Amino acid sequence: MGNYATLIGESDGIIQLTTWNVGKWDGKLKIGDYALISPGVRILSAKMITIGNSCMFGRGAYVTDSDWHGVYDRNEVAGSPKEVILEDNVWIGDSAIICKGVRIGKNSIIGAGSVVTKNVEPNSIYAGNPAKFVKKLDEQEIIPRKNFYSNPKKLKDDFEILDKLALKDNTLFGWIKSFFYRNKDH
């Protein structure tokens, strides 16, 4: 895991970063600097998944380098894995699926709910099932996520504002009440 990663977990959106290291399988996962990983993201490796700098993952996105079972022999562990590479500054939308053997070019965006089975050109938007080319992006206009960290004072102030907004409805009375009138999900 690189520097300045932001992982946002929730009780109903646990983040799963898994490498499968059994027998002939030696999964590896490399995540670059400034990654943003939202609730429910699953990244599962039986071979190698490389994620570049400033990549962002929407809620429930899934990246895998394996089928996890053979096509005919469902007991065959991990099928035949193929490396996955996400170059720098890639944005994977909510619930998108990135399949084995895929390379996503730098600055590209994958639309929510898309299923990516083939390589994606740099500076492009792809969407759909299967994902198809939608639009070319102007590389000169793209501002990478790492720029968010260029002013530490502003970053600290911004996070304090976000914390206040997230917690504004919390009160001492509400906290005490939660002990006596528990939500059925908690």
Predicted regions and their residues:
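A generic "structured core" feature
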Residues: 109-111, 115
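C-terminal segments of enzyme domains that contribute to small-molecule binding surfaces
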Residues: 26-27, 33, 76-99, 129-186
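Conserved active-site beta-strand element of glycosyltransferases/polysaccharide synthases
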Residues: 126
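Short beta-to-alpha loop/turn elements within the nucleotide-binding domains of ABC transporters
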Residues: 102, 114, 120, 129
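Short cysteine/histidine-rich zinc-coordinating motifs and their immediately flanking basic loops
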Residues: 12, 121, 139-141
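Conserved catalytic segment of ABC-fold P-loop ATPases
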Residues: 105-108, 121-123
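Short arginine-rich
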Residues: 118-123, 153
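Flexible, glycine/small-residue-enriched loop-and-beta-strand segment within the central core
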Residues: 1-102, 137
